[in-house]
Amino acid sequence: MSAGEISTPQEYIGHHLNNLQIDLRTFSLVDPHNPPATFWTLNIDSMFFSVVLGLLFLVLFRKVAKHATSGVPGKFQTAVELVIGFVHGSVQDMYHGKSKLIAPLALTIFVWVFLMNLMDLLPIDLLPYIGEHVFGLPALRVVPSADVNITLSMALGVFILILFYSIKMKGVGGFTKELTLQPFNHPVFIPINLILEGVSLLSKPVSLGLRLFGNMYAGELIFILIAGLLPWWSQWLLNVPWAIFHILIITLQAFIFMVLTIVYLSMASEEH
């Protein structure tokens, strides 16, 4: 179904919630209105925009670092320095280990998630219209953080780092004891401890990914509802106030993802 064939608000909303997918068995684009009953599909729009925004972050920050001056900085350099100072201060307050990786990781997470969230402020029909009429794409979603696959993948990366730092700082034996001898320090309670600590450990990446996804999906859906249910000449009455409020949500969700990552890695680096 193309944008020109959409005749009802329900069809409009459904159209904008479809991802551009590729079937990994045939390497062909998936018809969003007749999807195959298979797990082997890939949301290539989410991957494309997340990679492009990640590269944009690297290019912009490298350019600032390359042309940084000790004199009066420009506006963009000042903004970058404020972000770096803010993230560095957050890491110093919350992480008590000695790893030099945490501050760059926190900066990358904050800016990358912020840029992905920021895509939600683009006009709903702009890039999907270009994708359909210029490139012939059957669907296109432009907010990577509104895709649960992206947010859980990022959370999985954080989870791997949690395991890495837990084993690095405590050793395999210390990490095993943490899972089996807490909170009840007696061998008879090892099965119960393992269940409790296992659930606690696994809940960290799940809650981290789902929190970001849920907030950004809801924000995207509200923009789609406004565009799909109201006539074009009255949409700005709700779009503008919601966009202003959504800027706070965008920034807050990037900050929360960064903070929880720092806290989880700090917990992994410390003894209970």
From Swiss-Prot:
Subunit-level organization: F-type ATPases have 2 components, CF(1) - the catalytic core - and CF(0) - the membrane proton channel. CF(1) has five subunits: alpha(3), beta(3), gamma(1), delta(1), epsilon(1). CF(0) has three main subunits: a(1), b(2) and c(9-12). The alpha and beta chains form an alternating ring which encloses part of the gamma chain. CF(1) is attached to CF(0) by a central stalk formed by the gamma and epsilon chains, while a peripheral stalk is formed by the delta and b chains.
InterPro entries, A to Z: ATP_syn_F0_a_bact/chloroplast (IPR045082), ATP_synth_F0_asu (IPR000568), ATP_synth_F0_asu_AS (IPR023011), F0_ATP_A_sf (IPR035908)
Superkingdom field: Bacteria
Entry keyword annotation includes Transmembrane: yes
Major subcellular location class: membrane
Location of the protein in the cell: Cell inner membrane
Entry GO terms, CC: plasma membrane; proton-transporting ATP synthase complex
Source species: Cronobacter sakazakii (strain ATCC BAA-894) (Enterobacter sakazakii)
GO function term, MF aspect, one: proton-transporting ATP synthase activity, rotational mechanism
Residue ranges crossing the lipid bilayer per the database entry: 41-61, 101-121, 147-167, 212-232, 243-263
Gene: atpB
Protein name: ATP synthase subunit a
Classification via PANTHER family: ATP SYNTHASE SUBUNIT A, CHLOROPLASTIC (PTHR42823:SF3)
Family membership: Belongs to the ATPase A chain family.
Record has NADP as a keyword: no
GO biological process, one term: proton motive force-driven plasma membrane ATP synthesis
Cysteine disulfide links: none
Keywords: ATP synthesis, Cell inner membrane, Cell membrane, CF(0), Hydrogen ion transport, Ion transport, Membrane, Transmembrane, Transmembrane helix, Transport
Function: Key component of the proton channel; it plays a direct role in the translocation of protons across the membrane.
Membrane topology annotation: Multi-pass membrane protein
